[in-house]
Amino acid sequence: MKAVIYHAFSHKEAKDHDVQELGTQRAEAFVRAFLKQSIPHMSQQDCESHLQRKAVILEYFTRLKPKPRPKKKSKGLSAKQRRELRLFDIKPEQQRYSLFLPLHELWKQYIRDLCNGLKPDTQPQMIQAKLLKADLHGAVISVTKSKCPSYVGVTGILLQETKHVFKIITKEDHLKVIPKQNCVFTIEIDDFISYIYGSKFQLRASERSAKKFKAKGTIDL
């Protein structure tokens, strides 16, 4: 630091800047006189301290990476745990058709609102498209065709829908589990009848709202 402050001009630098060449001692005396004149209140000891000051190199500091926070575990039960606890099962004392008639009335009103009123001049294609994406819990559903003859004619209120089956309660208070595969179902509301081909309907209720169904002329079981 001292060598930098008291660095004397070379012959070339002195000539370029048109200054008189000074030796190291004369340069040091000039700097001391300049400081004393510029900062008269500073003591001689402080001046010496500033002139002798050296740069301090600090150690390299490595920033510690933050520790990853543990993921919060879901407080709710998983779908597997719900199945193991049989939370989706309908108790035998609750398997009564009359208990679910209010649900059916709510469903009919829901469909009427969804279709902006089921009027005689309403296009059947529009109703069909709405029903394919609608929530069917509470609908009266019937099996009209099936490769298993025992399923044909079964009618009841839809209580549960999974990816592969419909669970319906009949008027005789029997809970029936009907597979969608190889079955054709009908849903009737206000004289409109909609057909559902179960083999093409193997989706969860939550997935159907985003599904694009294509119209086809004939579909085999």
From Swiss-Prot:
Q: Which residues are reported to carry the modification Phosphoserine? A: S10
Q: Which domain of life is it from?
A: Eukaryota
> Per the UniProt entry, what are the Gene Ontology biological process annotations, in alphabetical order?
rRNA processing; tRNA 5'-leader removal
The entry's localization annotation reads: Nucleus, Nucleolus
Q: What is its main location?
A: nucleus
Q: What GO molecular functions are on record for this protein?
A: ribonuclease P activity; ribonuclease P RNA binding
Keywords, A to Z, come to:
Nucleus, Phosphoprotein, tRNA processing
Q: Does the keyword Nucleus apply?
A: yes
- One Pfam family cited in the UniProt record for this chain: RNase_P-MRP_p29
Q: List S-S links within the chain.
A: none
**GO CC term (a single one):** multimeric ribonuclease P complex
Does the keyword tRNA processing belong to this entry? yes
Q: Which residues cross the membrane?
A: none
Question: What is its biological role?
Answer: Component of ribonuclease P, a ribonucleoprotein complex that generates mature tRNA molecules by cleaving their 5'-ends.
Similarity comment: Belongs to the eukaryotic/archaeal RNase P protein component 1 family.
**Quaternary form?**
Component of nuclear RNase P and RNase MRP ribonucleoproteins. RNase P consists of a catalytic RNA moiety and 10 different protein chains; POP1, POP4, POP5, POP7, RPP14, RPP21, RPP25, RPP30, RPP38 and RPP40. Within the RNase P complex, POP1, POP7 and RPP25 form the 'finger' subcomplex, POP5, RPP14, RPP40 and homodimeric RPP30 form the 'palm' subcomplex, and RPP21, POP4 and RPP38 form the 'wrist' subcomplex. All subunits of the RNase P complex interact with the catalytic RNA. Several subunits of RNase P are also part of the RNase MRP complex.
Q: What protein name is recorded for this chain?
A: Ribonuclease P protein subunit p29
Species classification: Eukaryota, Metazoa, Chordata, Craniata, Vertebrata
